[in-house]
A protein has these predicted regions:
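Short glycine-/acidic-enriched loop or helix-start segments at secondary-structure transitions
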Residues: 43-45, 62
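Short glycine-rich anion-binding loops that position phosphate/pyrophosphate groups of nucleotides
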Residues: 38-40, 57-58, 113
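H-loop (His-switch) and adjacent beta-strand-loop-beta switch element
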Residues: 53-54
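Phosphate-binding beta-loop-alpha motif at adenosine-nucleotide cofactor sites
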Residues: 48-49, 98-115
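ATP-dependent small-molecule kinase phosphotransfer cores
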Residues: 1-32, 58, 62, 66, ...
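C-terminal alpha-helix
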Residues: 121-132
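Short secondary-structure boundary/capping segments
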Residues: 24, 41-43, 97-99
Length: 132
């Protein structure tokens, strides 16, 4: 619900400006990990490490469907897929901070990869970058 709501209200530039200011205050001292569709391009464009997680539409819909099902929420896979597709369309085409990977982000396609393996890859990336 939070992700969907954020996508809906983020089309309003005034809302985005206010939320970006809050996020920047939270991360002002560094040493934070943040997740979001424009964290690396708008909120923290100078972040030391940026990861852009991606997955196919079908994979993301399946994951969301499983998450909803585990919580006991009634949903069917096709409606979840359509909702994900609409969210992508809305986020990619908004005029203010559209969804895109930062040019210096490491892109990880997590399609078919378990969450713990994706997390391990990110931890390895961070460890390598911090040692460099």
């Amino acid at each position: 619900q939070v992700s969907d709501g954020a996508s809906v209200v983020s089309v309003y530039p005034g809302v985005r400006v206010a939320l970006v200011a809050v996020q920047r205050r939270l991360g002002a001292d560094g040493g934070v990990v943040m997740e979001g569709r424009d964290i690396g391009t708008v909120v923290f464009p100078d972040a030391e490490i940026k990861v852009f997680l991606d997955a196919s539409l079908d994979e993301r819909a399946r994951r969301r469907f499983e998450e909803l099902r585990a919580r006991g929420a009634g949903a069917d896979l096709e409606s979840v897929r359509r909702a994900e597709e609409e969210r992508d369309r809305r986020d990619r085409t908004r005029s203010h901070s559209p969804l895109r990977a930062a040019s210096d982000a490491v892109v990880i396609d997590s399609t078919g990869i378990p969450a713990d393996e994706v997390a391990a890859r990110i931890v390895q990336l961070v460890q390598r970058r911090l040692r460099a």
